[in-house]
Amino acid sequence: MPYTKIDVNEEEKFFQDQVKEIQQWWKEPRWAKTKRIYQAEDIAKKRSSLKVDYPSSNQAKKLYKLLQEHDKNKSASFTFGALDPVQVTQMAKYLDSIYVSGWQCSSTASTSNEPSPDLADYPMDTVPNKVEHLWFAQLFHDRKQREERLNLSKEERAKTPYTDFLRPIIADADTGHGGITAILKLTKLFVERGAAGIHIEDQAPGTKKCGHMAGKVLVPVQEHINRLVAIRASADILGSDLLCVARTDSEAATLLTSTIDHRDHYFVLGATNPESPDLAALMAEAESNGIYGDKLASIEVEWTKKAGLKLFHEAVIDEINNGNFSNKQALIKKFTDKVNPLSATSNKEARKLAREILGKDVFFDWDVARAREGYYRYQGGTQCAVMRGQAYAPYADMIWMESALPDFKQAKEFAEGVKAKWPDQWLAYNLSPSFNWNRAMPPNEQETYIKRLSELGYVWQFITLAGLHTTALAVDDFANQYSQIGMRAYGQTIQAPEIEKGVEVVKHQKWSGAEYIDGLLKMVTGGVSSTAAMGAGVTEDQFKEKAAGK
């Protein structure tokens, strides 16, 4: 069978034109802070010969412009995790962006239909599918509103409130659901299905936890940078302006997959007792002898007590303080000036410096302290997050530190730390429902918290699970009352407030687009349709009059 004929001169011209187009695109102010480690030629070679323009890229441009304005005004786009089209349409009236939470999808929208806690063990297309669900709803309600408005005169439209239903969506990419190729494909899914931005965290796939669970395992700094590069490369191949948010879970992380990256060395714990046996071998031996459960756990606890677990710089400082030196503080300063959270000093270099200062080696073994799964013990914290945030910044539009508490001082330390190296870096903040807000701060401070954070550079802030919690509260309250007072519960606590507050869903047929679809039917049947949904007899006409009992 003969091959399809192609004009190689035209092929070459098309390629060179694409390269020039990509180069011009990358010169736009949008990319002034973005570092790419590949060339325009690399991207052009990996593109299809058929150019596809993705609507989500327009949404990404819109989101970038929105955040630029917030950054300029020291304000923030603040939003929450949306569960469904009802929530998205109501949010659009008041908020300028939409969030899609992996946690919410895990519990309510897995494509396997199997609910789960936030372990990112749902199928890879789960969150992209939810994005598409909400994106299609946004497009539908935008079309519906547009037709409704254009059926009015210009004078009537000027008096009619307008809702921008096309609020940009930022979605949860978890850890990327695998290696680099998985991240490339996941990014493509998000672009195709309507996301304006995505966030990805530096936890290890397979052990990923909700940011407010224990047992988080980090990947090395460079491994996460590779993920960020993969996201940008995938978006570049698709010609998308997709925003990338780099999340770090290092503030509370306790484990690390590998010590290959010297930037992590400062935060790795090791045994300082030379008599400490290898923990993993000790645990394996105990299991082979039939020891399990609490007894096995007690072996690890006892080992930890005797091992003298410390960070290397702590071990060195202890040696100085316990030694016979007259200038201890000067020696400590000499060491910590070169070995600190942001110095990126390797353990090898730190050992050499300690030997010069002390005249001897400091015993420190991070291998014997490894967990039974092989992970290294890690002691994160705010400065660890700053280190990682600084490393990720050139490859991401926003940086997010997952935190254990809504601690303004900590948020300030992180913001100032990242901005010390990257002054124009945008930041994101999780206003998590996992925090006990009423214990953390009084109501007056809750009210100003978003504003205070925005002044530090947190341009995008979000309550991950507010969609879930508001639904739970509303349904629990209604179900309780309904069980006791029957239809009075619906009439007085649902329908009456809907009417009073002007919540358009009270006319759910109209909200669902029945009039819009009737218009389509009439358009294709010559203007008449006996099966129109909103014709004579529709019960929604009752809402044109004063509701009974009001």
Curated annotation (Swiss-Prot):
**GO MF annotation list:** isocitrate lyase activity; metal ion binding; methylisocitrate lyase activity
CDD domains membership? ICL_PEPM
Q: What is its EC number?
A: 4.1.3.1, 4.1.3.30
InterPro entries per record: ICL/PEPM, Isocitrate_lyase, Isocitrate_lyase_ph_CS, Pyrv/PenolPyrv_kinase-like_dom, Pyrv_kinase-like_dom_sf
Compartments, as annotated in UniProt? Glyoxysome
An example of a Gene Ontology cellular component annotation for this protein is: glyoxysome
Per UniProt, what is one Pfam family of this protein?
ICL
Q: Which GO terms describe its biological process?
A: glyoxylate cycle; tricarboxylic acid cycle
For activity, the cofactor(s) needed are:
Mg(2+)
Keyword list (alphabetical) reads: Glyoxylate bypass, Glyoxysome, Lyase, Magnesium, Metal-binding, Peroxisome, Tricarboxylic acid cycle
The family assignment reads:
Belongs to the isocitrate lyase/PEP mutase superfamily. Isocitrate lyase family.
In Swiss-Prot or TrEMBL terms, this protein is called Isocitrate lyase
Q: Which organism is it from?
A: Debaryomyces hansenii (strain ATCC 36239 / CBS 767 / BCRC 21394 / JCM 1990 / NBRC 0083 / IGC 2968) (Yeast)
Q: Which gene encodes it?
A: ICL1
